[in-house]
Amino acid sequence: MNRVELMRSESQNTSVSFKIFMSIVKSNRLPICFEGKDIQYYRNRIEQYLTENFGYIDCSGKSKVLSLREEIQKNSQYRNKLCIYFVDCDFDDNSDIYNKQDVYITPCYSIENLYTSDRVFEKILSDEFGINPSNDEQSELFSKILSEYRNRKREFFKCIEEFNFYVYLIKLNQFGISYNDIKISDLVKINIDSVTKSYTSISKVLKDIDLNNFDLSKAQSYFSGKDPEHCFRGKNNFHFLEKLLIKLQEDASKKDGRKIFPKKMSISYTTQNLLSSYSKYAETPQCLIDFLSSYKSLL
């Protein structure tokens, strides 16, 4: 798609989103705009800290959220209507939107980063896997699995580091590259007792661009001192969690040859739509609570 086609597509998308916006306003609900299916994470938080009386717009991308905002701001009939917007931080500069008080930017790369902390994993282990840390018979197993999770996560971050470095540099140099076709299995092999790289050269993963054009030291400087749990690509981090949970379930169900579980256990666990079903366990940043609460008096 060339630049003209892209602009035409974005314009059409904004037009559709604007019609949805008008419909929400007409029904006296609060319009809320998202990049995509982020409602799966945000819904409970919006209902808890702001209102249940809202309608949402899936704008299909960060730039389209901001384009819709601009369109609303230019419209004399709607510019004073309350509407709030949610976008991911990504590897973007974001300096042009930090001062927009009606736009919430995640404090991490994306909402998916809010699902992978040790604290979230502990809740999943307890509530979904039924391994109770307060039960004397299960507390040792709980601690063992948590320790293994931390070890695998550390290995995963080490393996995924190079990929994140280059994705950051590609973004910095404003190359329009899509990573949707890159599966987690293209990057890492996730086992219950180890995480290793799937590739021998990063150029085999990022095939469409000459990586020799980039100065890796710039990425090293950017990521220095940052927590990969928060600053690495959220989708990759989230897929790591998904895969490891599957590996744990498989280990628990084995008749013999188990590596983590001392005896066979039946664990009722679904891999369907974890972003939505595990939203209740995900972190809720204080800045999100503050953002939502600040609009309560305006309704």
What does each of the following model-derived ranges do?
Residues 1-299:
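Acidic, divalent-metal-binding catalytic cores of TOPRIM
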